[in-house]
Amino acid sequence: MDEGKMRKLLVIEAVLDPVADKLLRQPSQPVKTIDGVVREVAEFLEYQMTLQHGGRGASGFAAVQFGEPIRLIIFQWDTLTNRVLINPEVVSEKDSVTKIEECFSIPDHVFIVARPKMVKCRGLNLNGETVTVKGRDKMARLLKHEIDHLDGILIDQIAERRLY
C-alpha cells in the first residue's frame, strides 16, 4: 500500500462524534466512475480488514464508516478472500431471523436485530463488471448490515432492542 497516496481515513464512531453521526445517518452517494480515488478507498478498506481480522473480528466495512460517503463495501467472502462491491443493491431477500449484532460505528453496544436469512445483491467489482452475490445466514446478515450503512441506516435504528 502506498502510504503517501493513502487518504487519511479514520474509523467513525457515531456515538462519540455528532459530525460523524450525521454523516453515517445520510445515504452515501453512488460511484459514477471507478477512478483512482475509488480504488484508493477500496485499498484502504482492504488494509483495515487485514488489521481488524485478529482484533474485533470485522467481517465487512462500508466506505462511509471511514469518512467516505460513497456506495462501496468490502466484506470477507471466505477465510482468504475479501470482495468489494460498488453501488450494491439488494435485489431479493427471503425469510427473517433475529440475532445478536454489533457494529464498529457504535462500539461497546450489542443489539438484537432481525435480518433476512437469504439475500441476493448486485453491484460492480473494481473492474466495473456487474456481479451478483448470494448470501445466506451470516453472509446475508453481513451484506444487509453493510448496505444499510450506505443507506444511512445504523443498527440502533432497526434493532428490536439494545442488550448493552
Residue ranges of predicted features:
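Positively charged
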Residues: M1-Y164
